[in-house]
Amino acid sequence: MTQTNDSPSIKAKKAAALKAVEFVQDQMIIGLGTGSTIAYFIEALGKRCQAGLKITAIASSERSMRQARLVGIPIVDSDTILELDLTIDGADEIDPLKQMIKGGGGALLREKLIASASKEMIVVIDETKLVNKLGKFPVATEISIFTFRHIVKKLKDHGYCGSLRVNQDQSLYRTDNGNYIFDICFPEPIDNPIFEHNRLKSFAGVLETGLFFNLAGRVIIGYQNGMTKIVA
């Protein structure tokens, strides 16, 4: 993981990811998040496993699972896990109360389930993800494919502006759970993320939102100069 030719942004992500690996100990059951920063974490964790670290892990996405297996991290079936020791995941935005927007990578439902099943969730970010208030980044909302157009219409009728996520070929994006994502764009910063989450979840067909709260433990911030800071 040489940093010689890395951009400042990549240097920040790698710095945070490498620091996070230090918190993983032998015999732990680890939850693996999804995203660009977590990809660096998985790469570094794989090297520790190759050097003798004994852990097991579950992944929040097929993408993270494939990468983990490729670098030698033992992956177990999520159905066998009652509790995880630690989840390492990123965020699209995080505020001073450790409320987050997640889901840019499309794995919000599994990410929230894994975090909820963990003794601690360590959030790994670069400095650009720090915000005073959430809302500049779209809020991913996972919705059922059954009557999905009605669900989207209902959300729009109640003032939620956004669009269904699509692939590069403009086909509708499907999550690993087989659902669609409606990305909601808030016109102003979100004053009460918990209220918005609960309101969205009250609509039939809304399975999960990318608003995360009461889940983050320590936060590892990577900076473009290669330094890190840990917020307890």
Curated annotation (Swiss-Prot):
- Give the top-rank taxon of the lineage listed in the UniProt record for this protein: Bacteria
Q: Which reaction does it catalyse?
A: aldehydo-D-ribose 5-phosphate = D-ribulose 5-phosphate
Q: Could you name the Gene Ontology cellular component terms for this entry?
A: cytosol
Q: Which InterPro entries match?
A: NagB/RpiA_transferase-like, Ribose5P_isomerase_typA_subgr, Ribose5P_isomerase_type_A
Name the positions where substrate binds.
34-37, 89-92, 102-105, 129
Give GO BP annotations, semicolon-separated.
D-ribose metabolic process; pentose-phosphate shunt, non-oxidative branch
Identify one Pfam family in the record: Rib_5-P_isom_A
Q: Does the keyword Ribosomal protein apply?
A: no
According to its UniProt record, the EC number is 5.3.1.6
- Residue positions of the active site: 111 (proton acceptor)
Identify the PANTHER family for this entry: RIBOSE-5-PHOSPHATE ISOMERASE
What NCBIfam families does the database record attribute to this sequence?
A: PRK00702.1, rpiA
The protein's matches in HAMAP family, at most eight in alphabetical order, are given as: Rib_5P_isom_A (MF_00170)
Q: What is the name listed in the Swiss-Prot or TrEMBL entry for this protein?
A: Ribose-5-phosphate isomerase A
